[in-house]
Structures are given as C-alpha cells and as structure tokens.
Regions:
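Cap/insert and terminal regions of metallo-dependent hydrolase folds
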Residues: 151-236
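Binuclear metal-dependent hydrolase catalytic cores
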Residues: 1-146, 151, 156-158, 215-237
C-alpha cells in the first residue's frame, strides 16, 4: 500500500544497474514505473547501464514526469557523467534525484525501507538491507540483505543480521581472491552463519567458476538453504 495515498499498488526498487540489466528489466517492469534505484557502489559492472535508463527516462515514450530517486555513494553523479562523457555541469535533474546515502540513515521507498551498511571494497561501497511487508502476508515484515561488492567485515554481518534472504556476492574462489575486495564461498558462508540469515543466494560469480566449486566452499561454513541467482529468478517473501 502506498503510505502517502493509501492506494494499493506495486512498488519497484532496483539495486544496481550493471551492463545488460536495463534490457532484462523490461521483463519485470516498465522503466518509467520504477520508484527508486539504489547503487551499492560506482564500479562500472554495477552501474554501466544507468545511461540506458537515463536516455529512456529523458527521451523515451511515457518518460517519467518526475525525477527518479537515486541513492548511492558520493561520487554517483560524477560517475554517471563519466560514463556518458557529459560536461561537468550536467545535473540530470529531469531524470534523477541524487541522494548520497549516509550510514545510520533509512530511506523510504513506498512501504520499503533501505538501510546502507559499509562494505569492505576499494571504493565507497555499501551493503543494502531492505525491509518491507510480505507479499503473502502484508502484516508481516520481511527482509533482504544485498552485499554489493565486499570482503567479510563486521558491518556486513551487522547489516545481514536475521534477514530472510541473504543475497551475497561470491566474487572469486579461495585460490583467486584478493583481500579487502571480494568474498570467496567460505567467507560468504561465514557471514550467513554469523548473521543468522534464513536463506543464502549466491551471486556475482565469475563465468569461469563452476557452481559446484562455489557450493563446496560455501558449505564449509554455511549449512542452511543455498541457491544461486539466475536471470529472471523470482523470490517471493
């Protein structure tokens, strides 16, 4: 339910917009109907398709009447300009309303609440805890934590504490991993266990990495439900 109008409708929040995601988005919602976009960080593999969204919202049929709330790190506007090769005075005020996410703050998107938690990555980066009413029982609060890109750290464990779904990056295997950048399966599983999550979904897996290798590492530290994110996958809470 829309907390402002009291009307029942579906709210749509997108977390990150890497290459190819804008095209895939159409299978789920028209881009003009988005309620907000949240960026975990500003590396290109997590925001490269934002210019496709920008072009649509400015020039496309049914372009939005108001700017889309865009939550992200301090450098978000600068990075959007870089991707488009736009001048320094381009504000994208027709397309986006930029908000620099602050630790300890909560951001409302309809009935959903977004809370950022500091991630351990070479740039300003956040894990995102999202809470809102259950699809099946609107009186019940459900939660998801998306790690973005991070290595294991206390703030990510704190953000994931007790969530129903833990959407975790598993960027590399234990043989490949660089510290303070990504998690391997063992460390991602450790976060899931220490945070006491209900279900883990592994994502951000490299195309050359076999799933059974990831599962084997995760199972060293996590014994709960484990799935792998796939294109078009739906999880109903």
């Amino acid at each position: 339910m829309d907390p402002r109008s009291g009307e029942e409708r579906t709210f749509s929040l997108v977390c990150d917009m890497g290459p190819g995601s804008f095209g895939a988005l159409w299978a789920h919602v028209c881009p003009c109907e988005l309620d907000a976009l949240a960026l975990s960080h500003c590396h290109a593999d997590h925001m490269g398709d934002i210019i496709s969204l920008q072009v649509y919202r400015k020039w496309g049929p049914g372009a939005a009447a108001s700017a889309l709330p865009l939550y992200g790190p301090a450098e978000t506007l600068r990075r959007v300009r870089q991707i488009e090769n736009a001048p320094d005075d381009e504000a994208y005020e027709v397309e986006f309303a930029f908000t620099h996410m602050q630790l300890g703050e909560a951001y409302q998107v309809g009935p959903m609440t977004i809370r950022p938690y500091r991630a351990l990555h070479p740039v300003e980066a956040y894990g995102l805890r999202i809470e809102g009413p259950s699809e099946q029982d609107p009186e019940r609060l459900v939660s998801l934590f998306y790690t973005g890109d991070t290595d294991l750290c206390d703030t990510i464990i704190e953000g994931a504490r007790g969530v129903d779904v833990f959407l975790s990056e598993v960027g590399f295997t234990s043989d490949e991993n660089e510290p303070d950048m990504h998690m391997d399966g063992t460390r991602a599983g450790e976060v899931a266990t220490r945070a006491g999550v209900g279900r883990m979904i592994a994502t951000h897996i490299q195309p050359w990495t076999p799933r059974d290798r990831v599962a084997s590492e995760v199972r060293q530290t996590w014994s709960g439900p484990l799935d792998f994110a796939t294109s078009g996958m739906q999880v109903i809470l």
